[in-house]
Regions:
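Short glycine/acidic-rich beta->alpha loop that forms part of the nucleotide-sugar donor binding site
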Residues: 144-147, 154, 164
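Short alpha-helical segment that forms part of, or immediately flanks, the ligand-binding pocket
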Residues: 127, 150-155, 169-170
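Nucleotide-activated donor-binding/catalytic signature segment of Leloir-type glycosyltransferases, i.e.
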Residues: 105-127
Length: 249
């Protein structure tokens, strides 16, 4: 007789956004907002094994900003990040996760020489680029479930300038970044009130988003299930759309 996963104690992690889909009662989400939008209170923040990321040079020269994410996803709003950079006198932006030219869409983003595109990068190349950045420009137009781009950037000492959607208000406090849904306010803040410490950003990521904490919190979830309880009283389900959030130019 075949047995399904439901016949065994189990925990399911949901990393993405869903709409109108009933999920397993033992679902864990990756931020408080992510959980609440699915009618749940069960979440564990993603944690990284920072030893895998190598050494961070907190005294490195930082003379550009960066965007990190799948630029082809409209909700990541790389165009918004480019517009922010272009609105700041002399600012340069390095786009990690996208190309200037796309065969299907042509010249998608900008001809500006102040904007550089690096495609999908990883390893030492990615670490080096993040370590030289003054900040992540991240004006997403959806409810971000978590955002590894945020914690990775913070680890390398780069503050986060983003929109107040999804997990961002939970992850980005005033010591490590600034959130707004308006381009002009983001530009004005970066130009006139940039006060961020690479050391503070780095230590915050190390202390709050590490693999040890994540493992400990998952163990608590596993113990709850092994004791015969479910993580949610009902099957979690999101009923409110998670995209098309506002970005004012």
């Amino acid at each position: 007789v075949e047995e399904s996963v439901a016949d065994f104690p189990h925990v399911v992690t949901m990393h993405g956004n869903t709409l109108g889909v009933k999920l397993d009662k033992n679902t864990v989400f990756v931020s408080r907002n992510h959980a609440e939008r699915h009618g749940s209170g069960s979440y564990v923040y993603n944690g990284m094994d920072w030893d895998d990321y190598g050494t961070v040079d907190l005294g490195a020269q930082r003379d550009y900003f960066h965007f990190l994410g799948k630029a082809a996803w409209k909700v990541k709003n790389v165009k918004g990040a480019i517009d922010v950079a272009k609105a700041m006198p002399g600012a340069r932006l390095k786009v990690l996760g996208g190309y200037r030219f796309n065969f299907k869409m042509g010249w998608r983003f900008t001809f500006s020489p102040r904007i550089s595109f690096y495609g999908m990068v990883g390893g030492e190349r990615k670490s080096s680029l993040l370590n030289g950045s003054k900040g992540l420009i991240f004006p997403v137009t959806w409810d971000e479930p978590f955002g590894l781009a945020i914690t990775e950037s913070l680890y390398f000492g780069a503050p986060v300038f983003g929109t107040p959607y999804g997990s961002l208000p939970e992850l980005v406090n005033k010591e490590v970044g600034f959130l707004t849904d308006e381009q002009d306010k983001m530009v004005a803040h970066i130009v006139n009130d940039y006060h961020y410490s690479p050391k503070v950003c780095h230590e915050y990521a190390v202390d709050e988003f590490n693999s040890r904490l994540m493992a400990e919190r998952y163990v608590q979830k596993y113990e709850q299930v092994l004791n015969g309880k479910t993580l949610n009283d009902r099957c979690p389900e999101a009923t409110v759309p998670y995209s098309h959030r506002l970005w004012k130019k």
